[in-house]
Amino acid sequence: MLRTCLPIIVLALAAVGGLTWAVMALRRSLARERRLARYDDLTGVRNARAFHEAAGAEIERARRYQHPFSVAAIDLGIRVGDDLVRAAAAALRGGLRATDLVARLGRDEFIVLLPETTAPAARIVLDKLRAGLAELRLIDGRPAGASIGGVTFLNPPRAVEEIIRATDERIAEAKASGTLSHVTWNEA
């Protein structure tokens, strides 16, 4: 009887092993796809989708606990190459706390979410970011420069789009200053 059952047992074990391998491969593939869906390939920072999700969650948290939060947009403002975009992302990541989030929104545009952060605390963080960005150089050796616009939300906005609109307004003010690197801040 064992002789007749042994091939069936071996086949069953092989099938279970094959299924286990397939499930593990599928899990690895899903984890990779989740990462690709939320991270920017070039820089390794979060992408716009991940920012929208995190900002939406922060709006809800701010509404529930009545805490302020801050957001800053960074625009490198010139046509820059991949190396400078990667360096800017690294400088931004290096100047943030573990609870903060940096995301790349466009070619040379980044946005930083500072949960439970007041305007004075956000300005301290932004000064660190600005210092890190000030060290970046273009190919010809000139400073890269950046415009930074931020908003502290004392009352949570209704939607993420309001965050984007408010930071875009601050960026426009920073660019209008005409300086190489300028920060504007507002409380909403």
Per-region residue spans from a language model:
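Short helix/loop segment flanking the catalytic signature motif in cyclic-nucleotide metabolism enzymes
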Residues: 80-84, 112-128
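Short glycine- and acidic-residue-rich catalytic loops of nucleotidyl-transferase/cyclase enzymes
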Residues: 103-109, 113
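Catalytic core regions of nucleotide second-messenger enzymes
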Residues: 103-104, 133-147
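Catalytic-core segments of nucleotide cyclases and related cyclic-nucleotide turnover enzymes
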Residues: 120-127, 153-183, 188
